Each structure stands twice: as C-alpha cells, then as structure tokens.
Amino acid sequence: MNYETVIGLEVHVELKTKSKIFSSSPNAFGAPPNTQTNVIDLGYPGVLPVLNRQAVEFAMKAAMALNCEIATETKFDRKNYFYPDNPKAYQISQYDQPLGKNGWIEIEVNGKKKKIGITRIHLEEDAGKLTHTGDGYSLVDFNRQGTPLIEIVSEPDIRSPEEAYAYLEKLKAIIQYTGVSDCKMEEGSLRCDANISLRPIGSDQFGTKTELKNLNSFNFVRMGLEYEAKRQGKILLSGGVIRQETRRFDEATKTTILMRVKEGSEDYRYFPEPDLVMLYNDDEWKERVRASIPELPDARQKRYVEEWGLPEYDAKVLTLTKEMADFFXATVANGADPKLASNWLMVEVSGYLNAKQKELHDIALTPESLASMIKLIQNGTISSKIAKKVFKELVEHSGDPEKIVKEKGLVQISDEGALRKIVLEVLDANPQSVEDYKNGKDRALGFLVGQVMKATKGQANPPLVNKLLVEEIKKR
C-alpha cells in the first residue's frame, strides 16, 4: 500500500513589543538571567494582568498579513499544566475564540504554486527557559516568562518536507515584513513544532499523528519530517500501529526520540481567564491596523519584475528577506543597474554571507558603496573581475570604491594602443593557439584572452581585448 504524508505546523512567534504581554517588565533578548521579570510574570498572589495593547495590534497585523479573518470578540483562557518554567502552573492563552482564523499563504515548490491554509492565530504568553546542567539539577531563567507570542497553526495541507520548508520560509518573510517580530530562530523568537501522519493515497481520513519538537532550524524541520515519515511508513507497512506521541528531533543522530505519549486538549483543563475581560476589536481599530501593513513579499516581488525587469526567480530570491529586499532597493536608488545589483547580491554578497555565516547587517558593505562600485563597472572604469577585489575591501572594511580603485591601481586598461601592443606580444608567443582559432577552435580565443588578462594582471578591458585579438588574428 502506498501512503501520503500529511503535515501541519504550529509556529510560535515572539512579538517585539517593548514590554511583556501582561506586565511592564522589559521585553528584550540577552539580559542576565532573571533581571527582566516581576511579580505579575511570576504569578505572585493578588497580582492582576494588564493586557498590552501593542501586542494585540501586532498580532492583528500579522493575522491580516496572513489573510486571516479578525474576530470582533475574543477572549483569553487559562491553559493549566505544571512545569518548572511555568511559575503560575497555568499559561494565559486563547482557546475557543482566537484573534484570527481561516487565513492562508501561497508557496511555490518545483515551479508549482499552492495555498496552505491557516487554521488560527492566537495570542498567548511565553514560558521561562530551562537550562539542564547535567549535574542533577536545572536552572530556570524567567526573563522570557510573559513575553507576548502569537501561535500560528496551519491546516494539515502540507504534503512533503519540502512544502513545509517553503511554508516556513514564506511565513517568516511575511512576519518580518510586517515588523512585528525579527523571527530569529537562534534567539528563540521563532519556534516550530510539526505534526505528521501518514494515510493511504486517496483516503480522506487522517492517520494518527506524531508531534515533533526541538526543531531549531528550517533544515532540521525538513530532516525531522523526512525521518519521521520513513519511521511511520516502516511501522505501517509491517502491520504495526502508530501511537499519538510527542517526539524530539536529535540533531546529532538526525532521528526522532520518544518524549511522551501525546496529551489532548482536555488534559490542559482550559477555562476562561477570570482576570481579563472580553476583548472587542471594532472596525475602526481593525482598519487602522490594516493601513499600517507595509508592502509584503509577493507584492514587492511583482513590482521588481514589472518595474525593473528582473526575472521572476531573481525577484523571488531578493524578496525572501526584508533586509535583502531593502538593500537591493537602496542600491538601485543610488544609481546601480537593477540587473547588475541583483547579480551581485545573489552571487557575491549571498556567497560571502553564507561562507561567513553572517547577515547583511553584520558586514561593512552598504547599498551606497555597492551602487558606487557597480557604477564603476557600468562606466568601464573597472571590470567585473577587478570589481571582486574592490568588493572584498568593501565587505570587510567599507570605504569609497573610487578611492580604493585609485589607491590600489585597479583602473581598467582601455587604452587601445597599449592593449594592442600586449595583444601582439601574446599572439607572437602563442602561434599554435592562433592556428587553432583560425581552424575553428573557438576555445583557443578564450586561452588567448586569458593570456592578455594575465599579462595585465586582470586589468584589461575584456570586450576590447576580444575585439583586438580577432582583428589581429585576421591579419595573420
């Protein structure tokens, strides 16, 4: 029997408000342990939560960007469970009346577009953070306790790990564009749990699902789902039964490990939060929030294609993160040719960032300096090959491209008389290559160009070198 994979994702996103969702404690990453918490976060007797209006607006903004219907009335509920990082023994969340529902985003995998439904988006508070020492005890940091979160629950519309990866990339991009979160997985501001099951192809009944945790990167989400699909497939094909359970992805072995048998919602004994009143979202408030939503990835991608003539693939890559899209737009605004700017960002800049494991904001390169360098290529002052030397200087130390070119003697040689002399010397030194080219071996010309470039230390104007070589060979 053949099976298909059914996947749903639960994504938690921390909202970057200045204070926490129900208290005035600061909401910032990286502070010393237990320095950003107060009696409300810790649930001291007699204290009362006060809802952060900015958190609601950020959640509403994200929900609108994800095409959700915004509830006119919503409420908060207590989710009851005991764990050391949860000092109140309950979490304030939303159960049966979430802020947003019935949304969707469009993904593209292997050239095919597909809509993935979003069941709901709700607000809740984050828990603290446990650090296991390995010495028989654990440390608890309550700085994260009470941080405003949105949980984004997808429909079980995802059919492969590749689709899950594409969904997460698109979701992250949209959230970052709205400005409500930085979505840094390494800091925990975006976290993902995955639910996966198998069912016979053609069936409309869902199989028993497994929840996967400890998925600390999009690649680990993909790896965990790939492994779990194979594990469940082997069990089903051998006549076994899948248990509903929670499993942890092990980064070292690239396998999933049983954590616990899965709880149902009834295990949490939800009931309405008695210390918070019903929240009413009137039309005026909704429209004000909607008006604050900036241009989103799909719209920007379309604009880059229509206004600047970029290929769709280039536009898609450039708009995948807001930081890259903004950098590209600023580079073009400073006079760079859009296609050249796109090529440099997609190849040289992205290659450097990947090799160094850095982000754009970590390097010295600016849109102004990149545009200035590209304009030197456009006006023939330097070649693309020489530009790579200038780029290395800009990306590591910043500076003025024109000044760098002059100080390092990198100006492209475009003097026809000077180049013709070098061309003649190269032709005299390589008579066999000349004969090969005359006999139809085009690669011989490439060799001769390389010899001229070598003689000029890469500073000769390549199109002019080609032209002069062909002219002089014809004379022989």
From Swiss-Prot:
**Domain of life where this protein originates:** Bacteria
Write out the catalysed reaction.
Answer: L-glutamyl-tRNA(Gln) + L-glutamine + ATP + H2O = L-glutaminyl-tRNA(Gln) + L-glutamate + ADP + phosphate + H(+); L-aspartyl-tRNA(Asn) + L-glutamine + ATP + H2O = L-asparaginyl-tRNA(Asn) + L-glutamate + ADP + phosphate + 2 H(+)
The taxonomy runs:
Bacteria, Bacillati, Bacillota, Bacilli, Bacillales
- What NCBIfam families does the database record attribute to this sequence? gatB, PRK05477.1-1, PRK05477.1-2, PRK05477.1-4
- Full protein name: Aspartyl/glutamyl-tRNA(Asn/Gln) amidotransferase subunit B
Under which EC number(s) is this enzyme classified? Answer: 6.3.5.-
Q: Which UniProt keywords apply?
A: ATP-binding, Ligase, Nucleotide-binding, Protein biosynthesis
Where, if anywhere, are coiled coils annotated? none
Record function comment? Allows the formation of correctly charged Asn-tRNA(Asn) or Gln-tRNA(Gln) through the transamidation of misacylated Asp-tRNA(Asn) or Glu-tRNA(Gln) in organisms which lack either or both of asparaginyl-tRNA or glutaminyl-tRNA synthetases. The reaction takes place in the presence of glutamine and ATP through an activated phospho-Asp-tRNA(Asn) or phospho-Glu-tRNA(Gln).
Pfam families from the xrefs?
Answer: GatB_N, GatB_Yqey
Among the GO biological process terms of this entry, one is: translation
